[in-house]
Amino acid sequence: MSSRKRLLRWAGGIMIVLGAGHLSLLALAAWEDIAGWAERGMWAAVPLALTDGGAVQTAESLQNKVTFWAGPGSFAVPLILLGCLTWHLAGRGVAVPAGIGWALATWCVLGGVLLVPSPFFAGIISGALIILAARKEDRSRAARDPGDGPAVIRARRRR
């Protein structure tokens, strides 16, 4: 297995574990709310309240919204999907763009700073691994075509 593939597989695995762990912990911590959705129907998770804005929200409705936005409405599901996509692309030998790694790392730094302590900081590792894998792709491409310098490689990317 190439080192680029290994880096991307680790990045994807970390993202999948973080997202699945987030959803699992939420299921353990807020099982009553989630079971209530099943009893009342999924539309009851975050009901649409068509009022003039003067309605007072109950503690139960606020807890429902918090549970929804901390679970299925959070970034855990897209993080799992991104992890699966990264894993799949690594298996096919397709490089994930470094911009994805930079965006993921930036998002995790911001989330980790705003919500300390949290596992957000573990997501920085995934972002860094994606960036490293993209750089290995650039270096291997330059090694295959020694007449092309970094400027030519960047120009090819823009096409």
Residue ranges and their predicted role:
Residues 1, 141-159:
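Short, intrinsically disordered terminal tails adjacent to the first/last structured region
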Residues 7-36:
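N-terminal signal-anchor transmembrane alpha helix
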Residues 49-66:
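Juxtamembrane membrane-water interface segments that cap and precede transmembrane helices
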Residues 2-12, 62-65, 69, 94-101:
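Membrane-water interface of alpha-helical transmembrane segments
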Residues 33-46:
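Juxtamembrane non-transmembrane "cap" segments at the membrane-aqueous interface
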Residues 90-130:
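Hydrophobic alpha-helical transmembrane segments of integral membrane proteins
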Residues 66-98:
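Mid-chain, well-packed structural core segment of small domains
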Residues 91-92, 135-145:
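Membrane-interface capping segments at transmembrane-helix boundaries
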